[in-house]
Amino acid sequence: MRLTAKQVTWLKVSLHLAGLLPFLWLVWAINHGGLGADPVKDIQHFTGRTALKFLLATLLITPLARYVKQPLLIRTRRLLGLWCFAWATLHLTSYALLELGVNNLALLGKELITRPYLTLGIISWVILLALAFTSTQAMQRKLGKHWQQLHNFVYLVAILAPIHYLWSVKIISPQPLIYAGLAVLLLALRYKKLRSLFNRLRKQVHNKLSV
């Protein structure tokens, strides 16, 4: 049985709740001592993990829609991507304001350059910013064929973000490895597409170098 447009609308409402409820929990935890001994790190890790969850969910939609033969599921992909960006922005903000502090924001640029795992994180965020800004149908029409080329960069985020997470933790635990493994699996499902993109990029680079 195929999903109807009305059912997809209710699914979107549920996904909005899934994006909002973790924020409400975080606010409650901050105000009621629900965090650990290092609340700043807990906030950073929580926001980062939630962004990763929405990134993985975004990548899951296309293969899932094909597997269960529910093409209307694709309509939820943009919503999930926007929640990924929202949580990634909270993650970056928590680092800038809580780790560095308002008085030390001038150090942010230096930190992002001198710490490789932060460099990967900010690259991922900038890509997500571009994808969020161009996610509307109007931007899709305006960019034409370049829209899909731009949004293929989500696969780069799927590589960089788990590495950023693994690199940022002092002690490797199962959790970041699980996120990395899921990202690899979701990318592996797109092996043919990624191979085609890589070959096309390699050809373009070769042609430019040959000029």
From Swiss-Prot:
Top-level taxon of origin: Bacteria
GO biological process, one term: protein repair
Cofactor note: Binds 1 FMN per subunit.
Signal peptide interval: none
Gene Ontology CC entries for this record: plasma membrane
Cofactor(s) demanded: FMN; heme b
Acetylation listed as a keyword: no
Pfam families, A to Z: Ferric_reduct
Membrane spanning stretches: 17-37, 54-74, 82-102, 116-136, 153-173
Any GO molecular function: oxidoreductase activity, acting on diphenols and related substances as donors
Keywords, alphabetical: Cell inner membrane, Cell membrane, Electron transport, Flavoprotein, FMN, Heme, Iron, Membrane, Metal-binding, Transmembrane, Transmembrane helix, Transport
Primary location group: membrane
InterPro entries reported in the protein's UniProt record: Fe3_Rdtase_TM_dom (IPR013130), MsrQ-like (IPR022837)
Membrane topology designation: Multi-pass membrane protein
Protein family: Belongs to the MsrQ family.
Subunit structure: Heterodimer of a catalytic subunit (MsrP) and a heme-binding subunit (MsrQ).
Purpose of the protein: Part of the MsrPQ system that repairs oxidized periplasmic proteins containing methionine sulfoxide residues (Met-O), using respiratory chain electrons. Thus protects these proteins from oxidative-stress damage caused by reactive species of oxygen and chlorine generated by the host defense mechanisms. MsrPQ is essential for the maintenance of envelope integrity under bleach stress, rescuing a wide series of structurally unrelated periplasmic proteins from methionine oxidation, including the primary periplasmic chaperone SurA and the lipoprotein Pal.
Database matches in NCBIfam families: PRK05419.1-1 (NF003830), PRK05419.1-2 (NF003831), PRK05419.1-4 (NF003832)
Name listed for the protein in its UniProt record: Protein-methionine-sulfoxide reductase heme-binding subunit MsrQ
Organism: Escherichia coli (strain SMS-3-5 / SECEC)
Lineage: Bacteria, Pseudomonadati, Pseudomonadota, Gammaproteobacteria, Enterobacterales
